[in-house]
Amino acid sequence: VKCRWQEGNRITLLENGDQYYPALFAAIGRASRRVILESFIWFEDEVGRRLHAVLLEAARRGIQVEVLLDGYGSPDLSDEFVGELTAAGVIFRYYDPRPKLMGMRTNLFRRMHRKIVVIDDTTAFVGGINYSAEHMSDYGPEAKQDYAVQVEGPVVLDILQFELENLPNSETARRWWRRRRHQ
């Protein structure tokens, strides 16, 4: 994202999932218009189910919710997990959705590794934290160490513009999900 310097932004550093998830889930809970979420990894563990719940609740409140996940980093979400979101109106997409040639992945090095969330065009979360319990301190010695920032202010519109320019067409996403579900 290329942005010009702008005054009036507020940035909060969030360390690991212990700080990131509560801040993000609360912000999604306050959303009044739109949530756009991109991530490399989203697992169906405790953290992933909590994210699922807050996005589902937002969609049921009439909030426009769009999700873009990497097809390699998040290949194992169940049809029920994703289907419940799409049934509620969530636009759900996979980046480069696992093409194979003779049963082998052909796209190992083409990934979407961004972790960005934009809420109501006023708040953004940007960083390195995926959606898995591995980012929580109670995961144990193998817990992942990472950071994100919560951003508020004029720069959020630049982040939003980047998101809107890089999200695939919504109708294409819905058709692809229907094809994947019926394979």
Regions found by a protein language model. Give the residues of each.
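HKD-type phospholipase D/PLD-like phosphodiesterase module
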Residues: 3-34, 38-183
